[in-house]
């Protein structure tokens, strides 16, 4: 596991070099200057989503098991090695929820998804839904495509079984990047589309064309949460054309209850305003809305709102 963590950290640092050498003026040029605001949404949604993200890191989570008093696991696919885990829950708070696993740093295959930073066209499954020129990072899209068809098949089944109209997508780290891809795909192929998208520790996963389309499509149905000085949301680098989406919620200091909403893409007052802790996973695997998420630091069995 330490080797995998080292590879992931080195890859992140390599991707970050263009960010590190950029001047403060260059960094400010890219982003929104809107002032931070109070978080007006029901933060219990974020707390529950964090618990379901944590469950993806727990191989012992079996069909029928519960996460807190809120959610029951209905289906899963993936071994966390060749295929990232994709879990489908029925949640009282979030409805039918797809939770996607973050990087398994003991797996070279899983870690490789974070390294293949080549931008590629959006997959044929939903390419005609996005503007021409929209691109995603190869490793993130490829990781999702290994579970995409099965997820798209099972979601309607469970929506019907539970008489549920809501579909929520969540994920942490690599799982968050996969969630950004999944939202685009499932918005097209699932009747009623996606109700809510909540992502934690989200890397830059697409280019500006994709980010603009995503913002327009999902609006306030989407939020991503950054914890403290986490470096992951600062990669892949903008010099390769990647752009962070809007609707950042930044927890600062890390693991605290001090959170604010930062409108617009790459908001200069948000996490871009501090120097990330390159190579450290402490904030990345931190406490998000009273729930810790992380392969090594989070709880198994997963809990909701206990931190």
Identify the residue ranges that each predicted region occupies.
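Conserved beta-strand elements of beta-rich interaction domains across eukaryotes
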Residues: 15, 93-94, 103-105, 174, ...
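Fungal secretory targeting signals
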Residues: 1-26
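A residue-level signal for conserved active-site and pocket-lining positions in enzyme catalytic cores
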Residues: 52, 98, 147, 197, ...
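A conserved cap/lid and substrate-binding interface adjacent to the catalytic center
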Residues: 70-169, 189-194, 216-220, 307
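Residue-level signal for mature regions of secreted extracellular proteins and peptides
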Residues: 9, 15, 46, 51, ...
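Serine-dependent carboxylesterase/thioesterase catalytic core
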Residues: 152-242
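Flexible, membrane-associating and regulatory peripheral segments of lipid-active enzymes
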Residues: 21-106
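Lipolytic serine-hydrolase domain surface
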Residues: 211-307
